[in-house]
């Protein structure tokens, strides 16, 4: 066992560090990229649109997250955006929020690795690999168990993923864990986080353990409630902008709230006014992740005046786009919407 621990420690030596957006003013460089070609020009236009979302004080900004972003070093970018009131709601894969951000709040790290590693050796040492990044599987199991502990502490019933993630924020606070966390910062700021496929991560392992041991009286996640709550945000704040990192469920879920509002009788609801997506997916296979925002306009989801696709890898493009919008400082004076408070408010009986 001691030899195994030493072998494992040999792989887990250099932690991934998170880049922020407040130190380096990238505005001059991004503005010069506007006179280049290809994805440089697309990125510059995307940055200007994300800045417009900040400048337009009526616009609620929804950030969507797909792909392995937090493990790759983008956590601080998102925390900086939350801290400076640049984001009003987040829709994410469960892995980014639970397996990666909350995992780090528990005190664990992601580690620099190699895409050329011997995966059979990693498996023997309980090291999980995400391309060139390592995660300690034994520590991930602690994260799984913590999700079960949180579920066990809650009143049985059906919750939206947002409501469960609020409890995760409370847990960080109560246990004195690392507050430099997306989950905690969103909890502190009243910014809702939705994970429509919440069971597809450590939350799923924790919840299945919780339900297995409490078969008749347990916590469950209601994904339709997620959809209803996010749609309510659109109904209450008609003008919206979406900044999409990757595609997948978070992208489609967020685009669909326009149609959902129409289904609920709000036929004059606006399409998303602003839309930017960073992706490496290809539109030609018909899959959602690479489908263009112009295509989304045919479904009545996204307006085409202020939309931009950037075909680039997120760890390169997101800090530049978010950093540009931060240093333009048009987020100053944006109202704090605190959608969590709005969604938690009990209806007044007539």
Swiss-Prot record:
Gene3D superfamilies, sorted: Deoxyhypusine synthase (3.40.910.10)
GO molecular function list: deoxyhypusine synthase activity
GO-annotated cellular components: cytoplasm
Family membership: Belongs to the deoxyhypusine synthase family.
Top class in the EC scheme: transferase
UniProt keyword annotation of Mitochondrion present: no
SUPFAM superfamilies, per database record: DHS-like NAD/FAD-binding domain
Top-level division of the source organism's lineage: Bacteria
PANTHER family per record: DEOXYHYPUSINE SYNTHASE, DEOXYHYPUSINE SYNTHASE-LIKE PROTEIN
Keywords associated with the record: Transferase
Coiled-coil regions listed in the entry: none
Pfam families: DS (PF01916)
EC nos: 2.5.-.-
Keyword Oxidoreductase: no
Name the record gives this protein: Deoxyhypusine synthase-like protein
């Amino acid at each position: 066992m001691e030899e195994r621990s030493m072998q494992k420690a040999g792989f887990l030596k250099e932690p991934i560090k998170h880049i922020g957006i407040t130190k380096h003013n990238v505005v001059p460089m991004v503005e010069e990229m506007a006179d280049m070609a290809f994805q440089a020009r697309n990125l510059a236009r995307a940055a200007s649109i994300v800045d417009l979302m900040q400048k337009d004080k009526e616009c609620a900004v929804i950030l969507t997250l797909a792909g392995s972003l937090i493990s790759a070093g983008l956590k601080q970018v998102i925390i900086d955006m939350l801290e400076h009131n640049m984001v009003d709601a987040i829709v994410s894969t469960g892995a980014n929020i639970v397996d990666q951000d909350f995992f780090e709040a528990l005190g664990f790290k992601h580690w620099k690795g190699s895409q050329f590693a011997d995966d059979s050796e990693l498996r023997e040492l309980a090291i999980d690999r995400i391309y060139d990044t390592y995660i300690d599987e034994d520590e991930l199991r602690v994260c799984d168990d913590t999700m079960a502990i949180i579920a066990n502490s809650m009143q049985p019933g059906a919750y939206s993923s947002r409501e469960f993630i609020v409890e995760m924020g409370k847990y960080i606070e109560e246990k004195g864990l690392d507050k430099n966390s997306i989950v905690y910062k969103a909890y502190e700021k009243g910014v809702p986080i939705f994970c429509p496929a919440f069971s597809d991560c450590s939350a799923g392992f924790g919840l299945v353990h919780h339900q297995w041991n409490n078969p008749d009286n347990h916590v469950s996640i209601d994904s339709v409630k997620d959809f209803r709550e996010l749609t309510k945000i659109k109904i209450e704040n008609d003008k919206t902008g979406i900044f999409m990192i990757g595609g997948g469920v978070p992208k489609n879920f967020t685009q669909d709230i326009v149609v959902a509002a129409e289904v609920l009788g709000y036929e004059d609801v606006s399409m998303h006014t602003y839309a930017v997506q960073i992706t490496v997916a290809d539109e030609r296979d018909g899959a959602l992740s690479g489908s263009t925002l112009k295509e989304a306009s045919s479904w009545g989801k996204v307006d085409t005046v202020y939309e931009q696709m950037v075909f680039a890898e997120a760890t390169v493009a997101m800090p530049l786009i978010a950093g540009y919008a931060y240093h333009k400082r048009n987020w100053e004076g944006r109202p704090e919407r605190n959608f969590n408070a709005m969604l938690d408010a009990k209806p007044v009986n007539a």
